[in-house]
Amino acid sequence: MSKVYSWRKLNEKELTRVYLDEMRRDFPPTELKPLSMILNSEADGTAHTWGVFDGETLAAYLLMVRPAGSRVSQLDYFAVLPEYRSAGLGAQLLADLPQHERGAQAILIEAECPDKAEDETMAVRRLGFYARCGAPV
């Protein structure tokens, strides 16, 4: 039986910590929006961030963008923390995401184009991961 992780939306303090401690490690500076922009989007309701927890410990985060009235949620940032990687958690979370994004008819995954990415190898790996999870790329 696979481990059960709990999902909940992060508050401003938690999101700030995730940005400073995790996102700056997980994404190159050219891909990372300023924290103030992310917090403003959360405050005005156009974005929210899921924290996925193993007990009380953060295992992954997914930052979603969905403007009011939109039926499409966009996966803007997604990362599994290093100690939880390579165990299938990322694929499990992508499969579970639609049940958490209530009201969305589709989920759009944003990913860097390899020829324009700062880190081409990472961009290719990301696209490969999404393709293995069943996303059309």
Q: What are the functions of these language-model segments?
A:
Residues 101-122:
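Conserved GNAT acetyl-CoA-binding A-motif
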Residues 9, 58, 136-137:
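Residue-level detector of beta-propeller blades
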Residues 122-128:
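Charged helix-capping and loop-helix junction motifs
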Residues 80, 86-101:
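Conserved acetyl-CoA-binding loop-helix of GNAT-fold acetyltransferases
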Residues 51, 56-66, 72-79:
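Conserved beta-strand in the GNAT
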Residues 128-137:
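Conserved acetyl-CoA-binding loop of GNAT-fold acetyltransferases
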Residues 40-51, 60:
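A short helix-loop-beta-strand connector motif used in the catalytic cores of GNAT acetyltransferases and
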Residues 1-37, 53:
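Short amphipathic alpha-helix that is part of the acyltransferase structural core
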